[in-house]
């Protein structure tokens, strides 16, 4: 079916209007009218081929919120008119241990990304959410609670689940001392989720101007990382540190902020490997771990939690012809806190 969107035609090129064909709605598929599509920093990395060879033309976008417009004859989970979300992957093998546990993002055969890859037939190029419509197997989409505005929902499908998953996995509850490194598109969701779960939340940021925002989102403390003395003052303070930063840092400074048995979870993808001083871990039985998005059951759990607690991403809604400027502003950290494209403008 004919689809209108925006695509990068080659590595590093500006995105331009682009028409392409999506598959027709199959027996187990749902079609959605895309209302909003979030801009993730990873979209920029992939358009610029900074994470390895990419497939062009590329229609980016894996933060998709819309309304169901048609369903296949075998669909049981959705009906026309439902609010629906699609995230970072659109398929997996469905048979391995991870998939059977609902951890499709760790599929042994590799998840099928929403874009910049091939669908499971190995031939069809996956095109993402910077477009006016989408078709997906019902098992890889999630229901959006009716009380949540779709513009603020779109980034939850990547930024939101990326923070919700480790917060749940490391059992954040009332009184847990959590630090969030960085207050950007990822970090601001970590603050909101951890605060809603009753944690004592500290934001660690090099941008003092963000303190008021951090506190408004639920943070109890704000520490500027520009002053080395501040690291000494909060040494051995945290049960869990969520690292959303992709810039080069001395990770050992932050590991020293963990209590005994504390864990630092790497979420932001650094440009270079960290140089970890093993003694920092051994001396207090600390751990350093990683986490990547979340599976379909956890995505649904997250959205239900957001519906119950009225949690949304802070967004700036743009028209499709502003995408290239939005990329520039995202790189310059000039957004509070996520750009979202109005799907009606494709």
How should each PLM-predicted stretch be described?
Residues 187-188:
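N-terminal Rossmann-fold NAD(P) dinucleotide-binding loop
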Residues 174-183, 193-253:
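Adenosine-nucleotide cofactor-binding segment
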Residues 3, 296-346:
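C-terminal hydrophobic helical "lid"/dimerization subdomain
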Residues 258-259:
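Helix-to-beta-strand junctions that scaffold the AdoMet/dcAdoMet cofactor pocket
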Residues 93-181:
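NAD(P)H dinucleotide-binding glycine-rich loop of Rossmann-like/cofactor-binding domains
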Residues 23-37, 50-100, 105, 145-147:
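Glycine-rich beta-strand-centered segment in the early N-terminal region that forms part
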Residues 268-285, 296-302:
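Rossmann-fold NAD(P)-binding glycine/threonine-rich loop
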């Amino acid at each position: 079916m004919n689809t209108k969107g925006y695509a990068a035609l080659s590595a590093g090129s500006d995105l331009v209007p682009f028409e392409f064909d999506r598959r027709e709605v199959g027996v187990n598929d749902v079609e959605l009218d895309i209302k909003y599509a979030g801009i993730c920093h990873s979209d920029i990395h992939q358009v610029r081929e900074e994470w390895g060879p990419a497939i062009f033309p590329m229609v980016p976008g894996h933060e998709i919120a819309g309304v169901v417009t048609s369903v296949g004859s075998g669909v049981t989970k959705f009906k026309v008119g439902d609010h629906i979300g699609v995230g970072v992957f659109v398929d997996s093998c469905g048979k391995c241990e991870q998939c059977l546990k609902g951890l499709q993002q760790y599929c042994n055969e590799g998840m099928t990304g929403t874009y910049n890859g091939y669908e499971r037939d190995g031939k069809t190029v996956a095109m993402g959410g910077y477009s006016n419509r989408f078709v997906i197997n019902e098992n890889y989409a999630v229901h959006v609670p009716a009380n949540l505005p779709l513009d603020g929902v779109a980034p939850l499908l990547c930024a939101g689940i990326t923070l919700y998953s480790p917060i749940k996995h490391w059992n954040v509850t009332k009184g847990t001392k959590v630090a969030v490194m960085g207050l950007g598109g990822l970090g601001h969701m970590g603050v909101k989720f951890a605060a809603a779960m009753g944690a004592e939340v500290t934001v660690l940021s090099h941008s003092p101007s963000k303190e008021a925002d951090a506190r408004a989102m639920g943070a109890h403390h704000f520490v500027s990382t520009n002053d080395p003395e501040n690291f000494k003052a909060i040494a051995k303070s945290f049960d869990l540190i969520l690292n959303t930063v992709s810039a080069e840092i001395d990770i050992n400074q932050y590991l020293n902020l963990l209590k005994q048995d504390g864990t630092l979870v790497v979420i932001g993808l650094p440009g270079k490997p960290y140089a970890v001083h093993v003694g920092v871990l051994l001396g207090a039985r600390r751990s350093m771990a990683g986490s990547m998005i979340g599976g379909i059951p956890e995505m649904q759990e997250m959205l239900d939690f957001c519906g119950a607690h009225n949690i949304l991403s802070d967004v700036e809604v743009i028209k499709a012809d502003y995408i290239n400027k939005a990329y520039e502003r995202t790189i310059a950290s000039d957004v509070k806190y996520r750009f979202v494209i109005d799907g009606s403008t494709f």
